[in-house]
């Protein structure tokens, strides 16, 4: 394939890293049909790797995770002259992501499906397929993140992508060491602008393809509310203050999340924030901002990525939502519960934040950082009792 003449410095550096990569240069590229994964495949081909495309069929219908994505991914493989394979993961996606998401919202938590999908539906199955079906030792994806191998700690370390606006390390904290040792992220040191330019240089059909702006399930159904309404019938309940004063009504707690201020449908003398979802009483509890902050949290099911599990308290930065800025906190390890041991995740901790936080939503991830390095992460628990989960 003839290439254009304009090459970014970041693209040239990425190409150099791929050419000097230690070990076998044979890889399966996870192709979604978007520009990021398309360029990932193109750079690997340009660097001389043996490349095969792999697309996971997640859902039926139209959209990036469905027919449209399959067609675009196949077109990219044809353009690059590489094989294209499709693996039907619809049943796994329905069970591990869709049903868990619905169950979580119904139970009053705010699940993080992208992290669960990365571990259970995407990276794990892709690595297994690549090794067993094609004898390929590595996989590559278009994620904006970096991996450092063989540091002083002897672990594969996960780092933020250099483009802070596109960094996806928050969703990748749950990947195990074995997976990180076999994954390649060629775009980790590119900006999105670099990616567009490089895709244009390669003449990729997806170079100007618009980005998905929401969770794939929300895009697929038109909105998150439409997705939830497909599975959960309306269930009217009360919106109350902490003292039980009724200030409004709702048609399902699944449409709310901790910290939410807009769209409550409540007229009050001052702005109110969601502070609790009570599935047993089918209530949404709200409070003024002065009463809505939390200075502590309990995190369970922790995956320690770049360091060994700490035995003593430590200071670090924590990110509690994908789009939120990291904040400083004091982490203290806690004894594991029986449930933690059953899930083979016997690591819990207590966090005390330097400043009150307003979006501590059970089910979301708390990801721990030291500068750009992901130390680990886990799931925010429903309560803040340091003795029980």
From Swiss-Prot:
Keyword Transferase: yes
Site (Interaction with tRNA): 143, 364
Record-listed ATP binding positions: 30-37, 56, 142
EC number: 2.8.1.13
PANTHER family registered for this protein in UniProt: MITOCHONDRIAL TRNA-SPECIFIC 2-THIOURIDYLASE 1, TRNA 5-METHYLAMINOMETHYL-2-THIOURIDYLATE -METHYLTRANSFERASE
Function: Catalyzes the 2-thiolation of uridine at the wobble position (U34) of tRNA, leading to the formation of s(2)U34.
Protein's UniProt name: tRNA-specific 2-thiouridylase MnmA
Native species: Synechococcus sp. (strain CC9902)
């Amino acid at each position: 394939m003839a290439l254009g003449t304009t090459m970014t410095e970041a693209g040239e550096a990425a190409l150099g890293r791929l050419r000097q990569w230690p070990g076998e240069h044979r890889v399966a590229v996870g192709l979604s049909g978007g520009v990021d994964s398309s360029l990932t495949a193109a750079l690997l081909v340009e660097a001389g790797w043996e490349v095969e495309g792999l697309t996971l069929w997640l859902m039926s219908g139209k959209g990036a995770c469905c027919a449209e994505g399959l067609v675009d991914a196949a077109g990219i493989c044809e353009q690059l002259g590489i094989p294209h394979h499709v693996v039907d993961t619809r049943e796994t996606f329905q069970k591990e992501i869709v049903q868990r998401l619905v169950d979580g919202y119904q139970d009053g938590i705010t699940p993080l499906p992208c992290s669960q999908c990365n571990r259970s539906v995407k990276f794990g199955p892709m690595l297994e397929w690549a090794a067993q079906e094609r004898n390929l030792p590595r996989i590559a994806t278009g994620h904006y993140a970096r991996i450092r191998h063989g540091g002083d700690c002897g672990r594969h370390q996960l780092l933020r992508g250099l483009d802070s606006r596109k960094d996806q390390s928050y969703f990748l904290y749950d990947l195990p060491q074995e997976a990180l040792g076999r994954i390649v992220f060629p775009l980790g040191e590119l900006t999105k602008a670099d990616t567009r330019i490089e895709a244009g240089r390669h003449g990729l059909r997806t170079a100007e393809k618009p980005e998905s702006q929401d969770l794939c399930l929300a895009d697929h159904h038109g909105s998150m509310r439409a997705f939830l309404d497909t599975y959960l019938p309306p269930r009217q309940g009360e919106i109350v203050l902490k003292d039980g004063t009724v200030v409004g009504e709702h048609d399902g707690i699944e449409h709310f999340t901790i910290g939410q201020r807009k769209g409550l449908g409540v007229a009050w003398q001052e702005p109110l924030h969601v502070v609790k979802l009570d599935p047993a009483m089918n209530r949404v509890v709200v409070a003024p901002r002065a009463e809505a902050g939390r200075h502590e949290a309990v995190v369970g099911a922790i995956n320690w990525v770049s360091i060994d599990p700490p035995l003593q308290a430590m200071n670090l930065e924590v990110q509690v939502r994908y789009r939120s800025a990291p904040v400083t906190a004091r982490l203290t390890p806690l004894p594991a519960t029986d449930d933690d041991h059953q899930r083979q995740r016997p690591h819990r901790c207590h966090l005390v934040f330097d400043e009150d936080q307003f979006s501590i939503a059970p089910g979301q991830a708390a990801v721990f950082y030291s500068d750009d390095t992901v130390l680990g992460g886990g799931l925010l628990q429903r309560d803040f009792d340091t003795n029980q989960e």
